[in-house]
Amino acid sequence: MKRLKKWVLPYYPYQGYQLPLYWYPSSDPNCLGHDLNILDYGVQHITNILQKRYCSLFSVFTICFPRVFPVDTTQDNTYFCNAMELFLRGIAFTHPSYIWVRERNDSIHQHYHLALWVDGSVCKSFIAIGEALECRWCNTLGVYTPGLVEYRSAEYNKIELYRDRSDLETIGQAVYKYSYLSKLYTKETDINTNVKHWHHNR
């Protein structure tokens, strides 16, 4: 019987947290570790949210293009930015804050990860919000393909952050989850893109 190749995921120490290093076996040092600009901003935002809001709901969404989409988006975030503008306008009552990152695996099109915080006193679930995001995304693309926005996993993995009540373990879970956005190995380091690869609203 052929033995499976086995390797251990290393960890990255960051401000007392043990975060996954998120790497594929590679000789390219640019594919290892985290973008500290993205990581630092998000972790500071989690701290700010805990100070400013009694309860905040947090999770991460993945937004993809259809497998067959006949437009070259290598140098373009227009579709995503237009969809986000409409989406955020529709959920303004939840007082959203967000950070998005642009990434690419083996697809000809990029995908996006969206870290979203909403007011937990007016929103208890990400299902309706995820459905709204998928609707805006599909309308912007001019296609309807269910599953382009992974919102059910966002609902399943949501984290509730409470001011003065969230323990270090809960905060650590939020930092761990957010750190996925800062991984380097899918940040298009091998493609000459001149477009913004991450953005936040505050």
Regions from the PLM with identified roles:
Residues Y98-S121:
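Histidine-centered divalent-metal-coordination microenvironment in nucleic-acid enzymes
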